[in-house]
Amino acid sequence: MADKQISLPAKLINGGIAGLIGVTCVFPIDLAKTRLQNQQNGQRMYTSMSDCLIKTIRSEGYFGMYRGAAVNLTLVTPEKAIKLAANDFFRHQLSKDGQKLTLLKEMLAGCGAGTCQVIVTTPMEMLKIQLQDAGRIAAQRKILAAQGQLSAQGGAQPSVEAPAAPRPTAIQLTRDLLRSRGIAGLYKGLGATLLRDVPLSVVYFPLFANLNQLGRPASEEKSPFYVSFLAGCVAGSAAAVAVNPCDVVKTRLQSLQRGVNEDTYSGILDCARKILRHEGPSAFLKGAYCRALVIAPLFGIAQVVYFLGIAESLLGLLQDPQA
């Protein structure tokens, strides 16, 4: 990305388009990831991604899989735009006379991009997680209440697909957080978000750049779109799995509502210790498969849009009405 100059408006538009397309395609998988990661202490309301999605559809309807999507669709445009534009900016600043960046400089550029994006990512994730996990908590509480009644009366086990109670909206959550905690309420889990997104960008951007370079024909200035897509998918999934333990910690810290008998956490280290003690090392890989399936197409689509230069074409048409 450092080998060509792209205007800032084009970078922002490309990032926004990529984010909107990507989120629309993979959001249900992201919802399953959040619910799987928030299952504590061996509780198995959902056994897998497919089990989670099936039960969500049965209890909350088809659009239940898109709870929290409005938050992502609203904020993913600035988030992706900042991430891609920042990485491109840092790569350009670190390059000398168009020479290929060293691995260290590529990692530094990725680090800068990951740091910049958390300005938007943290509040977006904070709101999204509350909305995504509300269905799991409501279903769990309903089941436990029904089990309490049945233990005295006898009868069959209640189903996890039982109807859920009304849940808050993103606007209500934002108002409540601002009223009770101020702006800091929206940035709860900022440290954990940095701990996830900075390493992810450090892994992703250099890996993508090198994979994309490998697939570029010597006679062409840039890689074909399918090479950029595959490179984005491979690099994205690898980076996502690598930082999944940090994502589990972040998700737990940002969840304001807890199910029955679920742990509360005072910080990153406390969260990591309790997860390790109560659930074992494998708990840090909860949702890793889902996260890889989310990040792979998300970044693949982003790189295709970015490298095809869709925004440049749109801006060109606006600047030249006769084109």
Swiss-Prot record:
GO biological process, one term: malate-aspartate shuttle
Annotated localization: Mitochondrion inner membrane
Solcar repeats: 6-93, 101-214, 223-312
A GO MF label: amino acid:proton symporter activity
PROSITE patterns named among the record's database cross-references: SOLCAR
Keyword presence, Membrane: yes
TM region(s), chain numbering: 12-32, 62-82, 107-127, 189-209, 223-243, 292-312
Organism superkingdom: Eukaryota
Membrane topology: Multi-pass membrane protein
Reaction it catalyzes: L-glutamate(in) + H(+)(in) = L-glutamate(out) + H(+)(out)
GO terms under cellular component: mitochondrial inner membrane
Key words, A-Z: Membrane, Mitochondrion, Mitochondrion inner membrane, Repeat, Symport, Transmembrane, Transmembrane helix, Transport
Family: Belongs to the mitochondrial carrier (TC 2.A.29) family.
Function comment: Mitochondrial glutamate/H(+) symporter. Responsible for the transport of glutamate from the cytosol into the mitochondrial matrix with the concomitant import of a proton. Plays a role in the control of glucose-stimulated insulin secretion.
The protein's name: Mitochondrial glutamate carrier 1
